[in-house]
Amino acid sequence: MNDVVPPAAAESAAAGVSRIALGIEYKGSRYRGWQRQEAGVPSVQEALERALSKVAAEPVGVICAGRTDAAVHASGQVVHFDTAVERPLKAWVMGTNANLPADISVTWARVMPAHFHARFSALARRYRYAIYNDPIRPAHLAEEVTWNHRPLDIGRMREAAQVLVGTHDFTSFRAVQCQAKSPVKTMHHVRLLEHGRLIVLDIRGNAFLHHMVRNIAGVLMTIGAGERPIEWAKEVLEARDRRAGGVTAHPYGLYLVRVEYPGEFELPERYLGPHFLSGLPDIVG
């Protein structure tokens, strides 16, 4: 299913029309993902478009940088839309937020050149997958992290993750229903960070396949628990077969934290998120 947008929004803004970019954060727990669904099924896109349409007093459709799955969160989603309606940038932020549910927020707005595209102008995307590693499940972080009660050896996970850095065929880590034309993607870094009882998979790449981060997390947790050798990550990668890749990790711990664009667009960069990782240092690159 394609994003529901006015025809002009797909490529470049028409004459007399402004292209607006927005920063979006959301808690995805109660949504069937980013993408608009059939009537009555909640999605982040539908809620955002409805709120924007109220501010514009006309239908507004948006294009996003990356379509997140059901129950997946974002602290750094980026969207764009085209409109001939003139509103102060503050109205696109505050007015839209006034019409959004509490688990979705617009964080900034910018007027963009006509050639900016939230998806196709992006250079890289960055995700974080938060694992709460403790025998007792974290009630206050329910639906915000993945809970793993087994002791995980982060050293083993770090060593295994290094084989995923670089340009590879990630067929073993894509969902069966993935519609991407090519399974070849480039991972700039795949890091494991510690933050109290949390183990955080921090991964940055040019693009990602359907369920790719969750499948990587599943493999690394299995290795961290000692159920498979460190070399298993390489074996899974080289198999180029999803059946070799083990269990897909739960969506609750996954966050789209940043989308990177060429400097010419001068988009703001907020904290990486999620909020409970605010003390975790950012590692550039």
Map each language-model feature to its residues.
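Structured-RNA-binding interfaces characteristic of tRNA pseudouridine synthases
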Residues: 1-285
